[in-house]
Amino acid sequence: MSDTEDLAALNDRLMAKNHALAEALSRAGKELTKAKSQLAQLAQPPLTFATMVKVDSTRTDEDGIQHASAEVISGTRRMVVPVASNVNAARLTAGATVMLNEKLVLVEQRDADTVGQIRSVKQVLDDGRLIVTDASGNPVLIRRSGALAYAGINQGDRIIVDPSVRLAIEALPAEGDKDLVLEETPDVTFADIGGLDSEIGRIRDAVQLPFQHRALFERYDLKPPKGVLLYGPPGNGKTMIAKAVANALCEGGYDTNGDGSISPAETHVKGVFLSVKGPELLNKYVGESERLIRLIFQRARERAADGNPVVVFIDEMDSLLRTRGSGVSSDVETTIVPQFLSELDGVESLDNVMVIGASNRVDMIDPAVLRPGRLDVKIRVGRPKTNQAIAIVDHYLTDDLPLEDGVDAHALSAVLVHDIYGTSERRHLCDVQEENGQWHALFLADVVSGAMLKNIVDRAKTRAVKESIETGLDVALTVPLLAAAVEDEYRETRDSMADVDPEQWSRINGMDPIRRIRTAE
């Protein structure tokens, strides 16, 4: 190989190396630039979050450069800071989140924070400011953010406030209170209730007549009752009656004259049923229970403003309105009862609003609640007698069920009830000693309730279903099957009597005070 060829080959190798070195140098330059960028990012000082309050000042110089300052709150510090020239001061809104650099210059605006402390609105002032309270009832005066400047905010609404509790950032729906008050139309009708014809007649007279015959009530200058109390032992239909009343009102009717003709106004009456979860109104924070009671009646007045009847149903009323000074609770009732009474017959009228309460312990309700003019009508829903029990069982034992050949449902109901109401030793639960020291026998019939009757029928049906599964055939409901269900209920009730507190048990079940219980062997 000649020298020329050697030189050419060397030149090619050097050019290849030079090209490789150039590429390596280019890659190194890019990596160096990337590293510098990363170092610059790591060396960038942190930005501080703050809440925008208002623009403090703004002007534009002869060169068109903006010079502005803004009032912000960072943590608990209230400051006036300069605004960067590239941030449009005219677009800064109260309540928005802004960013401050290390020199406390406002360099960026972001959307308002969607999380924060929640407060309840106690009062809306004429200038739009709000008095809000925390869970302990401590009041604070705050301003609205730009997003809430023209929002309709009412007493009792919930809002999110900024960390300094100076600005209302966002309004929230009052979902917590809606959980306590259920606005519904129950599916229970009076036809679904057996054995309570007298009680149903009384409550229909008290609740339905005033709303469906308003012209007659006005003609006789008769005002409808403000409230109805359903009381008596548990499981006998108090809540079902209230639901049936609500169903009847919600279905609506026409305001009629005395002769049954529709009044000239042809007013269509359609009611609203507000079901209040009584025990859930109790709150450990002072004033919170009273606020919830005010909200309940406020909602009732709003629904009744158009002339439609509103029923406020309070179940377990004794848990909410206990006798003041009784010493059987934490004395929270000393403020709850007056608040309830002031809503019931205070300055603001309760036209078209009726309160229906249900309780197993009427002896624990404050007497001021029970006096005439408040809960005017008091209806005792007691334990069913024999004929009433048969009417109740007839609702659950019907002819469309698989029955024993040659026996109709009503006959089975009668056999079942007579077995339950027997006073032989086989239905003897226990012996009880009254306060006068006398002992007497207690039978299953003495503690029977509508709920127990339904439970016995359900036991028999469950037995029939299980036997049908085993045999593959429809097993009929027979007298022996019903008798076995009664026996099961009797044994469970008898066994439970050994563990009850005699005094409390007798009061809850509407009996005379009992000192001791001696169970049957």
Swiss-Prot record:
Residues that hold ATP according to the record: 235-240
Any one Pfam family match given in the protein's UniProt record, by short name: Prot_ATP_ID_OB_C
Keyword ATP-binding assigned: yes
A GO CC annotation given for this chain: proteasome complex
Top-level taxon: Bacteria
Key words, A-Z: ATP-binding, Coiled coil, Nucleotide-binding
Gene Ontology MF term list: ATP binding; ATP hydrolysis activity
Coiled coil: 4-44
BP terms from Gene Ontology: modification-dependent protein catabolic process; proteasomal protein catabolic process
Family the entry assigns: Belongs to the AAA ATPase family.
Subunit composition and interactions: Homohexamer. Assembles into a hexameric ring structure.
Alphabetical list of PANTHER family matching this protein: AAA-FAMILY ATPASE, PROTEASOME-ASSOCIATED ATPASE
Name of protein: AAA ATPase forming ring-shaped complexes
Species this protein is from: Bifidobacterium longum (strain NCC 2705)
Biological classification of the source: Bacteria, Bacillati, Actinomycetota, Actinomycetes, Bifidobacteriales
